[in-house]
């Protein structure tokens, strides 16, 4: 068995300048003594990087052009995400090379089911988010500012070298909304181009077109949360809106970025099967039948602790609706050992990938094709 990575040996291998994440839930890779921890971390370290995504206004005001919130920000103030600041009429990212969470995950945890099965994803996040989802699972860092978290100093070059050192095939921007640290993502992606590493993100898709086009230049795959299918749900449950997310999905398709969709089903909020059907019809029409769709089980957390977990039967009914609408790769997520977590050939129905938790067995797939009937299966099955 491979020895697990601890915080101490990670820091030792990656360089003494790294610091450590405040949230143990995102870095459960071992323990470290208090004295070592105090030497390893730095609270509130802010990595300034001028952003190209803003428009100057009068009186040193600026308008952010990164996401549809279009924040107008005065001098020494920050945008809604809390990680971008107007410094004398220029807009700066405060989280460049400054992640507060670093972990090596199975790629299926993102979740990506059609990208290098059983591969290792070097995963990272900074503080901040441009949504305030009432059901957020990582709210301790997504709703924090970089002043409040314990952070690494981890340059894009160090990200690449660390990912390779730990035999990762993928670098994943995840846990919070990676759009808020886009400058960091872009640089990591550019360095990764010359290495045998895929670059992926798990995003809410709430981003303007030009920044998204820039990301498409460096992304291999994107997992997008389609959190609901009404503007009312987005407004009341996330603080965002639906239309920009749908536009993001269409742009990703046009740019041929492999995309998977996650729909977290919250009881009484977005689990109406008629709306699920409308969503699946839109996906089929606009994105095609082969896009993987994950119906994920909700568990009580953050501001929705009084709502019970999603009944498994609800997820199963949603999966039936999606398949009835012609979607070919529909999954039940957050339900360990559920048969809806396996991948089947849509032509001959043979099982191609068996998933029991994070134990993955590729048993009927060869070079991206079903071994039984030869049907091409959408996805990324080889690294660069």
Where are these regions (language model features)?
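C-terminal segment of N-terminal export signals and the immediately downstream linker at the start
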Residues: 4, 25-70
């Amino acid at each position: 068995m491979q020895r697990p990575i601890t915080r101490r040996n990670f820091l030792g291998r990656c360089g003494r300048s790294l610091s450590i994440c405040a949230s143990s839930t995102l870095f459960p890779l071992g323990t470290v003594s208090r004295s070592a921890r105090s030497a390893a971390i730095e609270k509130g370290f802010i990595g300034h990087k001028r952003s190209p995504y803003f428009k100057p206004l009068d009186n040193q005001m600026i308008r952010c052009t990164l996401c549809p919130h279009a924040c107008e920000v005065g001098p020494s103030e920050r945008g809604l995400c809390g990680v971008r600041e107007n410094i004398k009429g220029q807009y700066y990212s405060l989280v460049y090379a400054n992640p507060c969470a670093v972990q090596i995950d199975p790629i299926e945890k993102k979740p990506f089911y059609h990208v290098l099965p059983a591969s290792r994803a070097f995963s990272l996040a900074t503080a901040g988010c441009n949504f305030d989802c009432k059901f957020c699972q990582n709210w301790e860092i997504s709703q924090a500012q970089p002043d409040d978290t314990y952070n690494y100093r981890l340059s894009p070059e160090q990200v690449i070298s660390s990912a390779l050192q730990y035999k990762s095939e993928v670098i994943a921007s995840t846990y919070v909304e990676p759009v808020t640290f886009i400058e960091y993502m872009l640089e990591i992606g550019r360095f990764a181009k010359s290495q045998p590493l895929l670059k992926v993100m798990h995003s809410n898709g709430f981003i303007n077109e030009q920044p998204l086009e820039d990301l498409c230049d460096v992304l291999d795959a994107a997992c997008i949360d389609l959190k609901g299918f009404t503007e009312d749900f987005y407004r009341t449950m996330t603080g965002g809106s639906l239309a920009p997310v749908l536009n993001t999905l269409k742009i990703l398709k046009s740019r041929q970025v492999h995309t998977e969709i996650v729909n977290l089903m919250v009881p009484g909020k977005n689990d109406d099967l008629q709306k699920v059907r409308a969503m699946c019809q839109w996906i089929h029409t606009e994105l095609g039948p082969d896009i993987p769709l994950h119906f994920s089980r909700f568990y009580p957390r953050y501001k929705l602790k009084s709502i019970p977990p999603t009944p498994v039967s609800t997820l199963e009914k949603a999966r039936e609706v999606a398949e009835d609408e012609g979607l070919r790769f529909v999954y039940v997520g957050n339900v360990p050992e559920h048969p809806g977590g396996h991948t089947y050939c849509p032509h001959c129905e043979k099982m191609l990938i068996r998933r029991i938790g994070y134990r993955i067995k590729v048993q009927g797939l060869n070079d991206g094709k079903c071994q039984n009937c030869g049907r091409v299966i959408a996805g990324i099955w080889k690294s660069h």
